[in-house]
């Protein structure tokens, strides 16, 4: 299992817009073949910080995800909302 944890920080006045933009990516991603989980998490201590927990069966499923229209649109629309670049950490899932 291929797991990615993405951290995204957005401007104070862009929180609701971020949620709207990411909702479309979430809805498309959970329908993809090979997707096991796609959670959008908001930090209760820092409401402008979000984490995306993505689990796919393998790297090929992740590669496919990055070709989808919902992913490409989301990435494009995120740029002006973020305070800096996204950070990603990749994990190998052992015990889901």
Swiss-Prot record:
Entry's Gene Ontology cellular component terms: cytosol
Keyword Isomerase: yes
All copies of domain ABM, residue ranges: 2-91
SUPFAM superfamilies assigned to the protein according to its UniProt record, in alphabetical order: Dimeric alpha+beta barrel
Reactions this protein catalyses: (2S)-2-hydroxy-3,4-dioxopentyl phosphate = 3-hydroxy-2,4-dioxopentyl phosphate
Entry EC no(s): 5.3.1.32
Function: Involved in the degradation of phospho-AI-2, thereby terminating induction of the lsr operon and closing the AI-2 signaling cycle. Catalyzes the conversion of (4S)-4-hydroxy-5-phosphonooxypentane-2,3-dione (P-DPD) to 3-hydroxy-5-phosphonooxypentane-2,4-dione (P-HPD).
Matches recorded under NCBIfam families: PRK10486.1
Protein's name according to its UniProt entry: (4S)-4-hydroxy-5-phosphonooxypentane-2,3-dione isomerase
Organism: Salmonella paratyphi B (strain ATCC BAA-1250 / SPB7)
């Amino acid at each position: 299992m291929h797991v990615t944890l993405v951290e995204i920080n957005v401007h104070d006045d862009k929180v609701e817009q971020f949620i709207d933009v990411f909702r479309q990516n979430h809805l498309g991603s959970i329908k993809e073949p090979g997707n096991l989980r796609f959670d959008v998490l908001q930090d209760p201590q820092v409401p402008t910080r979000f984490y995306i927990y993505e689990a796919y069966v393998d790297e090929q499923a992740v590669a496919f995800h990055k070709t989808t229209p919902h992913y490409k649109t989301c990435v494009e629309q995120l740029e002006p909302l973020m305070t800096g670049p996204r950070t990603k950490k990749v994990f190998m899932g052992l015990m889901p």
